[in-house]
């Protein structure tokens, strides 16, 4: 009996230890059903917990006392945010940066287009992919205005409100509208892109919308937009430098003009969060920690061209590889905002939860840096070869990418 017991097949418990009270394995199909059921239950529980946590977070930030802070900021927005907008008469327009037949005449317009196409021919495919991704992101402006107009106590209720908050949303949107327009015109004139595929991607992205944590909360919303405006300024600025290095000064001027706008918009939203930290530090720093725990998702994360199921991941890999927008940029933005908002110095008015949120945010850049170093070391050890990924935007030509 002893020998028989020692040679019996032992079943394995869910923690991986042998169960000596059972000498027969359960049927494979039963085991598979158990694990699938357990995994589904765990995912459902996790989702319910996340939804409950977000509901509590939104409820806290939409309390009357919190919204009153935003309402009392109206005169401050009038004095410190609205002046960052440029009137239409002073702002650059797309016709200033791409050939304009009305200004050049038929012959001049034709010559300018030939010159544009000649310069565009020298831009590598990888940089074109990044440019299209940036343009698609800009063209989804209807989604972003809709999201901004969900922020309680800081929205345009009628669509033509005279409040400072409402005028800012409309003015910001008017300036942003030129970005996608000018990039779209350049791409059309360059002749290097499958514009129907680009346009389908824009169409699908606007139709898909975007997901944002705690979307009705102005605290979370302004933090998100401050981060994103800096990210787009960096992306367009890096694109300008990259294409200038390949001889396209006209495209560099376009990207530089867009980056300059984004920096003004970043300044506006950064000021708003700065003011919120002064007026309500506990709620604001907790909102900042909440957003960073869930990471700042990119606004075009749902982009889809109808062919590549992993289009955004491939675009992000191209941007990382080309130096257009990298993981280090993400960390750098966080470090900049922590310094600008003096998060480490926050003390007065913080609850215990607020202090924990402050400490979490201040420690996060170093954690991200360590993750970057580990990822770099793993990549060096694996010595992976690049994968050729076709992009429909450039007529399905492949771009060699280092994928995770």
UniProtKB/Swiss-Prot annotation:
Entries under Gene3D superfamilies matching the protein: Ribonucleotide Reductase, subunit A
GO BP, one annotated term: fatty acid biosynthetic process
Q: Which molecular function GO terms apply here?
A: metal ion binding; stearoyl-[ACP] desaturase activity
InterPro entries tied to this protein: Fatty_acid_desaturase-2, Ferritin-like_SF, RNR-like
Print the keywords alphabetically: Chloroplast, Fatty acid biosynthesis, Fatty acid metabolism, Iron, Lipid biosynthesis, Lipid metabolism, Metal-binding, Oxidoreductase, Plastid, Transit peptide
Origin: domain of life: Eukaryota
Residue runs in coiled coils: none
What would be one Gene Ontology cellular-component term for the protein?
chloroplast
- Provide the binding site for Fe cation 1: 138, 176, 179, 262
Sites binding Fe cation 2 sit at 176, 229, 262, 265
Q: Which cofactor does it need?
A: Fe(2+)
List the pathway annotation.
Lipid metabolism; fatty acid metabolism
Q: How is the cofactor bound?
A: Binds 2 Fe(2+) ions per subunit.
The enzyme's first-digit EC class, named in words, is oxidoreductase
**How does the record describe its quaternary structure?**
Homodimer.
Which family, according to UniProt? Answer: Belongs to the fatty acid desaturase type 2 family.
Function of this protein? Introduces a cis double bond in the acyl chain of an acyl-[acyl-carrier protein].
What is the protein's given name? Answer: Acyl-[acyl-carrier-protein] desaturase 7, chloroplastic
Q: What is the lineage of its organism?
A: Eukaryota, Viridiplantae, Streptophyta, Embryophyta, Tracheophyta
């Amino acid at each position: 009996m002893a020998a028989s017991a020692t040679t019996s097949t032992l079943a394995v418990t869910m923690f991986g230890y042998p169960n000596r009270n059972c000498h027969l394995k359960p049927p494979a199909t039963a085991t598979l059903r158990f694990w699938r059921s357990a995994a589904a239950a765990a995912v459902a529980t996790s989702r319910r917990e996340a939804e409950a946590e977000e509901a509590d977070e939104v409820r806290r930030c939409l309390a009357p006392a919190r919204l009153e802070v935003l309402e009392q900021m109206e005169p401050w927005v009038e004095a410190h945010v609205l002046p960052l907008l440029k009137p239409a008469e002073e702002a650059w327009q797309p016709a200033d940066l791409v050939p304009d037949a009305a200004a050049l005449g038929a012959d001049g317009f034709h010559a300018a287009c030939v010159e544009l196409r000649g310069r565009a021919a020298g831009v590598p495919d990888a940089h074109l992919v990044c440019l299209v991704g940036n343009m698609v992101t800009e063209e989804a402006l209807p989604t972003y205005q809709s999201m901004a107009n969900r922020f309680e106590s800081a929205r345009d209720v009628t669509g033509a409100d005279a409040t400072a908050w409402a005028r800012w949303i409309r003015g910001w949107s008017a300036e942003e509208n030129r970005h996608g327009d000018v990039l779209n015109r350049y791409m059309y004139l360059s002749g290097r892109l499958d514009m129907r595929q680009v346009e389908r991607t824009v169409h699908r992205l606007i139709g898909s919308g975007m997901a944002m944590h705690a979307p009705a909360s102005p605290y979370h919303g302004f933090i998100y937009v401050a981060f994103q405006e800096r990210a787009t300024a960096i992306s367009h600025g890096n694109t300008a430098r990259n294409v200038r290095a390949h001889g396209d000064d006209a495209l560099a001027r376009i990207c530089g003009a867009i980056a300059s706008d984004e920096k003004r918009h970043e300044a506006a939203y950064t000021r708003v969060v700065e003011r919120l930290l002064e007026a309500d530090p506990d709620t604001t720093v907790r909102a900042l920690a909440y957003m960073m725990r869930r990471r700042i998702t990119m606004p075009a994360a749902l982009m889809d061209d109808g062919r590549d199921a992993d289009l955004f991941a491939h675009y992000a890999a191209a941007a990382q590889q080309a130096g257009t927008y990298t993981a280090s940029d993400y960390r750098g933005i966080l470090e900049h905002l922590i310094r600008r908002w003096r998060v480490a110095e926050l003390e007065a008015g913080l609850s215990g939860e607020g202090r924990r949120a402050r400490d979490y945010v201040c420690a996060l850049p170093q954690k991200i840096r360590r993750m970057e170093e580990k990822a770099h070391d793993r990549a060096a050890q694996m010595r992976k070869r690049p994968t050729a990924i076709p992009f429909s935007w450039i007529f399905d030509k492949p771009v060699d990418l280092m994928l995770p």
